[in-house]
């Protein structure tokens, strides 16, 4: 059994008119089932409106399914008595770090979550130290978050979630508002947490380059899972990804075009090094 289990999830956004009658129903999720193993790094891809962000919000009880069940460490998110434990187990990081950072000083913000959990003061500071060190933000602990770059703010937001000692972190497009440098530093931080701390990562994104090193890639379209496999397996299906209005990494696209032109290359090339090695072999 995985740390996260989604069983036949259905979620509908319902819009009401002025008389509170149902006016429109948007079927955001249509029978999604996923089992995510503890310690894994899973990326969920999809264009806008695919259902991926709705799925993320169901993972720690921000939203509850219209039908189906979400289990976090065998706890149902729909059981109110378990909701606090669910949110301690599966921490959430959002697109905009400004919506998540509330402290006037970095270290105070990181300690806010553990303090509200009733953690003893001495342990709070131990957690703050460890979390800031893990995301490479110790040198900024006494600074105002307002003076940080977007990437630094997002790392502080991740540290704040880490300080609550979750077993899993759900990141809903955490790099969407960042420049390329900010995106790289945040993704590097997330991978280090996964490898060094053993934290399960569920990354929601539409940036193809961010998922190359994931253990597993899930593609959503129209509220359903349409592809599921390793990065190499998923990116081997370039024409299918284009059908779902998704791009592929630039090097994968180049290899695909060369293959379409008649060159014999492997499917699912993900790095420049892979492509160079194959071309060198073909041309030698």
Language-model features: where?
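Helix-to-loop junction immediately C-terminal to a conserved catalytic motif
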Residues: 60
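Catalytic Walker B motif of ABC-type/P-loop ATPase nucleotide-binding domains
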Residues: 169-172
């Amino acid at each position: 059994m995985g740390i996260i289990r989604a069983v036949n999830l259905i979620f509908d956004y319902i819009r009401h008119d002025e008389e509170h009658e149902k006016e429109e129903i948007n079927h955001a999720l249509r029978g999604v089932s996923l089992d995510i193993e503890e310690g894994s790094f899973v990326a969920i891809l999809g264009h806008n409106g695919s259902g991926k962000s709705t799925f993320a919000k169901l993972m720690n009880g921000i939203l509850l399914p219209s039908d189906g069940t979400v289990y976090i460490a065998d706890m149902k998110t729909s059981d109110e008595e378990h909701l606090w434990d669910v949110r301690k187990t599966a921490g959430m990081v959002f697109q905009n770090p400004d919506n998540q950072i509330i402290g006037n000083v970095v270290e105070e913000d990181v300690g806010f979550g553990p303090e509200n959990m009733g953690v003893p003061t001495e342990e709070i500071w131990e957690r703050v130290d460890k979390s800031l060190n893990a995301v490479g933000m110790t040198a900024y602990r006494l600074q105002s978050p307002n003076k940080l770059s977007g990437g630094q703010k997002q790392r502080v937001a991740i540290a704040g979630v880490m300080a609550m000692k979750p077993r899993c972190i759900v990141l809903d497009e955490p790099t969407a508002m960042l420049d390329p440098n900010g995106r790289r530093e945040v993704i590097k931080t997330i991978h280090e947490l996964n490898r060094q701390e053993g934290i399960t990562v569920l990354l929601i994104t539409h940036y193809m380059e961010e998922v190359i090193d994931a253990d597993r890639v899930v593609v959503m379209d129209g509220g359903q899972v349409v592809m599921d496999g390793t990065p190499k397996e998923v990116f081997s299906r370039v024409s299918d990804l284009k059908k779902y209005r998704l791009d592929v990494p630039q090097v994968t696209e180049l290899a695909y075009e060369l293959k379409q032109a008649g060159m014999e290359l492997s499917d699912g090339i993900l790095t420049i090094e892979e492509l160079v090695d194959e071309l060198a072999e073909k041309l030698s």
